[in-house]
Amino acid sequence: MKKQRSFVLSLLFILVQYTLAAQQLAPDSQLLKNIPYYEIDNEDAYIRDRCLLDIFIPAAKKEFPTVVWFHGGGLTGGEKFVPDRLLNKGIAVVSVNYRLNPKVTSPAYIEDAAAATAWVFRNIEKYGGDTKKIIIAGHSAGGYLAMMIGLDRKWLARHNIESDNIFLLVPFSGHTITHMTVRKERGIPDTQPTVDEMAPLFHVRQDAPPLHLITGDRDLEMLGRYEENAYMWRMMNVAGHKHTYLYELHGFNHGEMAEPAFDLLLKIIHNQ
């Protein structure tokens, strides 16, 4: 059996792996930065500072798909970025910052993810995007957020958005049990699995959007992440959901799996 990488090293890798030295944009494409997705006059200074998004808009194309991307970092760190592997591929990318622990606690992270997604539904047509082709994705903590707002209807319903209108859910190695940081807030150790209303697994349902679960190698992933996702796949099937898929990227650990997962994400989108 392959040696499990340490939790600390894996988390550090998540936080630094996406630093982009330069982003090569195609002519006539655009990268718009630091757009607030809450009301601009919000009285909360942390919301004004943190709750921003960037948009990459592809060149010379209309009614394009849009990937809403949530970064990883354990709900305690990380920074928005537009993945370079998604640039100039005929899709828009909306990269989202959300509030982090310890400045906030659950469910603030999910509230922000829902608010940003609602902003995209209401605004992406202005940039040429198709509201019927909005994909919610993210790595690690970002994958957890993607599943929570896609499976638990209440978060987007607060913005009068129906979560079933999401085109695809594509989490990269996301917790399907209650997130370890949420468990820590409640005094539960990260080695103690918990499934409650803050777990994607709690919200398994037949009529959810199509769900593509991508993980790294089961022997290299952190804290049983492959097995969590495999159980999610099984229970969605048991619930009667016809479009749940599970992909294991052999040879890649929790941090490394994101790079090949981006290519898989593009393939999934273009095969629809």
Regions inferred by a protein language model and the residue ranges of each:
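The feature captures the conserved acid-bearing segment of alpha/beta-hydrolase catalytic domains
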Residues: 160-164, 168, 174-182, 191-230, ...
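Alpha/beta-hydrolase active-site loop
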Residues: 105-125
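N-terminal cap/lid segment of alpha/beta-hydrolase-fold proteins
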Residues: 23-61
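Short amphipathic alpha-helix adjacent to the substrate-entry channel of hydrolases
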Residues: 79-96
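Primarily recognizes the serine-hydrolase "nucleophile elbow" in alpha/beta-hydrolase
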Residues: 121-184, 196
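Short beta-strand element of the alpha/beta-hydrolase
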Residues: 63-72
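C-terminal catalytic histidine-bearing segment of alpha/beta-hydrolase fold enzymes
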Residues: 214, 230, 237-272
